[in-house]
Amino acid sequence: MRFRTGKLTRVAIAAAAVLALGATFAAPLPQEAQAAPAAQADTDYCGGQCSDILPPGATGNATLADILANRVFGTHPAHSADQLGPYSDLAQGYPTLTDDKLNTFFNDSSFGVPADQVESVTKPRDDVSITRDKKTGVPHIQGTTREGTEFGAGYAAAQDRLWLMDLFRHVGRGELTSFAGGAASNQGLEQDFFRQAPYNEADYQAQIDYILATGGERGKQALADAQAYVDGINAYAKKAKDGRYFPGEYVLTGHIDAITNAGEIAPFKLTDLIALASVVGALFGNGGGGEVEGALSMLAAQQKYGLAEGTKVWESFRQRNDPEAVLTVHDGKGFPYADKPASPKGTAMPDPGSVTAEPLVYDREGSATPAKAGARTTVKAPAKLDKLRGIYDDGVLPRDLFSRKKGMSNALVVSGKYTASGKPVAVFGPQTGYFAPQLLMLQEIQGPGISARGASFAGVGMYVQLGRGQDYAWSATTSAQDVTDTYAVELCSPDGSAPTKDATYYRYHGECLPMDKLERRNAWKPTVADSTAAGSYRMQVYRTKYGLVTHRATVGGKPVAYTSLRATYRHEADSIVGFQMFNDPGYVTDAKSFQSAAQHINYTFNWFYADSRQTAYYNSGLNMRRADGVDPSLPVKAEPAYEWKDFDPAVNTAAYTPAAEHPQSVDQDYYISWNNKVAKDYGAAAFGNGSVHRGNLLDDRVRALVKKGGVTRAALARAMGEAAVTDLRGEDVLPELLKVLRSQPIDDPAVASAVQSLESWQAAGSQRRETSAGSHTYGHTDAVRIMDAWWPLLVEAEFKPGLGGELYDALRTNLSVDESPSAGHGPTGSHAGSSFQYGWWSYVDKDLRAVLGEDVKGPLAKPYCGGGELSACRDALLGSLKQAAAKPATEVYPGDDNCAAGDQWCADAIIQRTVGGLTHDKISWQNRPTFQQVVEFARHR
């Protein structure tokens, strides 16, 4: 796909925009120091065999003139969109990929910048320089002192992501609407986040104090690094504000006057970094929860089938330890954790019909009230800004960014025993959605005790979080093991009277204590960017020693509050020490030292490592030791006997499982991860880890490569690229569907034609891929349409008659039926890339194989399709297929603000969600990491 890069230089673009705006809105560009050669690092052991990419581009800041030029002329500031084309092109280019073509689709990630490739050098102070390369504009930070190095990292982060960082610190503080506007999406997002991670200023400071008290010398160094990083951010922000080349979004959202320059960019504080860390933790580093919803579906199963049989049915759908699930650690070693106890104790099931969700929002006024929701007000602004009116009317971030299940990112790592060179090969990266600017930013940091290049979340980039060191590379995927429990807290009244469900006092160790109330009052007014009329509301969350109140209910007739207790709550920043270690070449020297560093990270991540000699894996997280007999999948009584072992509510700490009990491995033949089940006996925290998972798309391909031997970087990248355009349903479930349909001759011509289309598509690889680059038309387009229309219909036809409506709906709450690219309900909303993680693929697969009489390990408790009769099952599938085949494309793909109805390619297409003022072209769907590395180290220190 070709992308318009624009023939104007950034200066010319800005000048054109200035002419359009008038001199009063001119924003001079920052003056860079004279370019000087950047010294090549002599500590790079990759030998030119490390590559990476992060779309859409390194530049994430845009002046008001830049934004207007983008909206009027379609131009982009330098390096803000130059990675989108190469990233997109891999969807068509992967089949013929060779090692020497890798950097057509990726960039050389060697340390340093060759002298003839230096675009600019900035020296924000004497002890640090920021060199940017001509090809990508990525900052290469070189410091002579530790403080200067981190100051430079903060300065570079502000150069590239100042607006984004400011936005997310307000998200982290539950203040998005008051900062960016009252759009309905902004309201919903800040409410979802505040519900998960409500804090007050003392809580933020307490996290800093905890690191100082418990982190040793490394903890103290980490906070010193963070302070220098903050100082660098603030230095650039002040310079940009004074020089009037700050991000134009500050003008459009009413924070700075474009004519007088009145207003401010509020200085960042260390506590802002804690708020930012809480956002990262909530998005990608959590696991577990949902026990109330699990209890409700169990009750529905018990109501339909009786206590014993209903529990058995529920457990078969829960799939805590499915024997057919694809595993990351597949050498047979087990790591028992969070499984069902033999004799559950303390389970606190709600009385039927008693559960109510805890209210969050109070005191609504103006456009926050239902009566005035959607009301808009046009503010006065120069006519030249009309093109920018309402750019945030739909919000700055997806409404469901925090409410939807997430667990993205993938990894493919092969031991040197099976590669052509004898050196390990890895293709891996985080799948964090698509935003403009991107949530991640690329950087290289070289200074005392730090030597790394890679990606960091903007605003907490003191260290490279995912990337490469001198002779090793690392990456992560979300593991989301269960580190969150739900407690049923008994309510009480301080005067001894009978409490109601709404009581704000609870029992703790025999005392009747008041709940803490955490509040946030937000108000907004219309701006050029967000015309939502003025409004306000108050958010309120009650906190107990057992966590945050999420629901109210009765248990055995007694009123309770269900609370969510997350191990990482109040500890989101603790992981800073582990990331510091990853960047320290004096600490990470081999697989074991890398695993040791990963032990200092409390986020629930799968960590992968490769150097020239070894590969390794480690699963990190605060895996608490539960009381004996506690079922982690269901609510438990809030009593001392069922608390986490050594639980200290004052700081939310407990006894945790030792490192040896965390899933881990060194030099396994290969590792894959796409948020699949981690290891044998390691209980899945959520529904859906069964016989069919998108991890199978990787595992099948990498296993075949390893069996053949001679694996290269390109071969592994091809395997990833093929999986990235493959429909999981077509590859791993459609064969069983076709077996059932073909069990007898098909007489209906329309159905026969549909089956033939599906068979042809399946035989060709079940791909969702353009016929040629830029065609915007899929091969086997009709089969893809039929599959998209059929899947939700066939699941309902297969399961709803047997389960009954109530249980079917309850299980759909636990696990969504589908997650196709066009469904519009992906982890980061529609057009988000990541697909096929959450769905009923395993249920359909196991049920159909049982009906076909095939061997099924870990089967569903009952057959559902056609009541277990093959002919009746076939009839159900035929009927739903006929209905699906008749659906026109305009109904299957109804269109949205970005796509016309019936446009299949567009419905799938990835769109960089506009967080700043710049827009970008759509790209073809791929299911792959946002930031991605391809590495093969040539030698070792």
Task: Give residue spans per PLM region.
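Secretory targeting and sorting signals
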Residues: M1-A36
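Charged, long alpha-helical assembly modules
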Residues: Y778-C865
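Stable alpha-helical elements in mature extracytoplasmic
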Residues: Y204, A222-G232, Y236, A436, ...
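Glycine- and hydrophobic-rich flexible loops that cap the catalytic core of alpha/beta enzyme folds
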Residues: G447-P448, A452-G461, L466-Y472, A476-E643
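Terminal end segments
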Residues: L54, T63, V72, H76-A78, ...
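Substrate-recognition/specificity elements adjacent to catalytic centers across diverse enzyme folds
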Residues: A38-V425, P430, G454-A455
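Hydrophobic alpha-helical segments
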Residues: T484, Y603-L705, L794-F799, L803-L807, ...
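Second-shell loop/turn segments in exported
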Residues: T149-A153, Y204-A224, L565-A567, F579-P585, ...
